[in-house]
């Protein structure tokens, strides 16, 4: 799997993501500076990592979404290429129009930084094939603006089309306000586009891929991507 990690000013999770991708795919990802106008030849996966691109000025991800490299990302996605946006990357995907909705301030107006539980809603996508439908995984979050919001029609479409892949839940998989850490609509933690090749999610699976972290639940996402691409080759 040949992956490319986009690097914007203020991003700070690119090395975590690179370590996870290399560990699981066996290949060193390329680092692509935001001012580039093309992606490395043969790229299979584009990743937008977490951090605070451009200091989160204007809105989280708003400036990064207008970077030169994003035209290449849009073309890549339109051609069926896999795109993963984590945390600030999710915000950039929404601001760029690759995903619907927006990420707002957390409901309690506080930065959240701890492990959470997610329920995997489907196992038949490139981003979830490493899990079972209904499986509960534990991964970290670290955000102040992860409250997913969209108009009612968009939410209905996301639900009706099965485009919600991850939801905040309890350790046993229950969904509800008690377990919805940031107030996101329908406890949404991760969604895909209509075609299913672009995923945005607030939690950080890349930080739970090694035993030293005390949990390896994030491995399934990356292992599933590798398996999907190997099968498609």
From Swiss-Prot:
GO terms for molecular function: ATP binding; glutaminase activity; phosphoribosylformylglycinamidine synthase activity. Keywords: ATP-binding, Cytoplasm, Glutamine amidotransferase, Hydrolase, Ligase, Nucleotide-binding, Purine biosynthesis. It catalyses: N(2)-formyl-N(1)-(5-phospho-beta-D-ribosyl)glycinamide + L-glutamine + ATP + H2O = 2-formamido-N(1)-(5-O-phospho-beta-D-ribosyl)acetamidine + L-glutamate + ADP + phosphate + H(+); L-glutamine + H2O = L-glutamate + NH4(+). SMART domains: GATase_5. Residues 3-233 form the Glutamine amidotransferase type-1 domain. The active site is at 87 (nucleophile), 204, 206. Disulfide bonds: none annotated. Its main location: cytoplasm. One of its GO terms (biological process) is 'de novo' IMP biosynthetic process. Pfam families: GATase_5. InterPro entries: Class_I_gatase-like (IPR029062), PRibForGlyAmidine_synth_PurQ (IPR010075). Pathway: Purine metabolism; IMP biosynthesis via de novo pathway; 5-amino-1-(5-phospho-D-ribosyl)imidazole from N(2)-formyl-N(1)-(5-phospho-D-ribosyl)glycinamide: step 1/2. The keyword RNA-binding does not apply. The keyword Nucleotide-binding applies. It is found in: Cytoplasm. It comes from the Bacteria. Its EC number is 6.3.5.3, 3.5.1.2. CDD domains: GATase1_FGAR_AT. GO terms for cellular component: cytoplasm. Part of the phosphoribosylformylglycinamidine synthase complex involved in the purines biosynthetic pathway. Catalyzes the ATP-dependent conversion of formylglycinamide ribonucleotide (FGAR) and glutamine to yield formylglycinamidine ribonucleotide (FGAM) and glutamate. The FGAM synthase complex is composed of three subunits. PurQ produces an ammonia molecule by converting glutamine to glutamate. PurL transfers the ammonia molecule to FGAR to form FGAM in an ATP-dependent manner. NCBIfam families: FGAM_synth_I, PRK03619.1. Part of the FGAM synthase complex composed of 1 PurL, 1 PurQ and 2 PurS subunits. This is Phosphoribosylformylglycinamidine synthase subunit PurQ. The lineage of its organism: Bacteria, Pseudomonadati, Pseudomonadota, Alphaproteobacteria, Hyphomicrobiales. The gene is purQ.
């Amino acid at each position: 799997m040949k992956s490319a990690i986009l690097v914007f000013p203020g991003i700070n999770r690119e090395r975590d993501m690179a370590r996870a991708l290399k560990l699981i795919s066996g290949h060193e990802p390329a680092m692509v500076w935001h001012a580039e106008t093309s992606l490395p030849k043969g790229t299979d996966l584009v990743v937008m990592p977490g951090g605070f691109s451009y200091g989160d000025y204007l809105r989280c991800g708003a400036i990064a979404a207008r970077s030169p490299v994003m035209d290449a990302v849009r073309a890549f996605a339109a051609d069926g290429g896999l795109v993963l946006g984590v945390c600030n990357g999710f915000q950039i995907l929404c601001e760029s129009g690759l995903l619907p909705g927006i990420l707002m301030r957390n409901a309690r107006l506080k930065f959240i930084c701890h492990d959470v539980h997610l329920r995997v809603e489907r196992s038949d996508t490139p981003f979830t094939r490493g899990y079972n439908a209904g499986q509960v995984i534990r991964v970290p979050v670290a955000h102040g603006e992860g409250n997913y919001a969209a108009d009612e029609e968009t939410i209905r479409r996301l639900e009706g089309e099965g485009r919600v892949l991850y939801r905040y839940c309890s350790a046993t998989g229950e969904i509800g306000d008690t377990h919805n850490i940031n107030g996101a609509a329908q406890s949404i933690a991760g969604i895909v586009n209509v075609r299913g090749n672009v995923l945005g999610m607030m939690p950080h699976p890349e930080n739970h891929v090694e035993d030293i972290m005390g949990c390896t639940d994030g491995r399934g996402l990356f292992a599933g991507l590798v398996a999907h691409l190997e099968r498609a080759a």
